[in-house]
Regions:
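C-terminal all-alpha effector/ligand-binding and dimerization domain
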Residues: 57-133
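Conserved amphipathic alpha-helical segments that form helical-bundle/coiled-coil interaction surfaces
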Residues: 1-62, 79-86, 94-106
Length: 133
């Protein structure tokens, strides 16, 4: 968590910071998954992660202005903090609600990418595989 805090405590998000954050983000999500001890869930997520835009960091960088990017990434990372605390306290229902809400950030980003295909395509060339063009 401190690595993510450090990366997002900058004035400007560079491609290097995005890459470092994405790696940290993937480790965080994998750590939560592994800690579940649910082998069926682990296998299902592994299969899901082979789909376009499905893995945890698939839609990074965000597809908006740099200021909005920073705000969204800070929001998503704050959700990481809240989820981890809820899990530590054994708050199952809250953890589930936070995890579901956390997926909304990716969905918002994907909707923005689809709405702004011309601007999004250079950042995420694979978007053409999903929506054509």
């Amino acid at each position: 968590m401190t690595e993510g805090d450090r990366l997002l405590n900058t004035k400007k998000l560079t491609h290097e910071i995005y890459a470092e954050y994405a790696a940290m983000n993937d480790r965080f999500h994998d750590g939560i998954l592994q800690a579940s001890g649910n082998s069926a869930l682990i296998r299902a997520v592994a299969l899901n992660n082979k789909l376009p835009f499905a893995p945890a960091s698939a839609t990074l960088p965000m597809l908006s202005t740099h200021v909005q990017d920073h705000d969204w990434m800070r929001y998503a990372h704050r959700q990481h903090h809240m989820l981890l605390e809820a899990l530590k306290r054994g708050e199952g229902a809250r953890s589930q609600a936070l995890a579901i809400e956390h997926t909304e950030v990716a969905q918002i980003n994907m909707r923005a990418a689809l709405a702004q295909r011309a601007q999004s395509a250079p950042q995420l060339p694979a978007i053409r595989l999903v929506v054509g063009g």
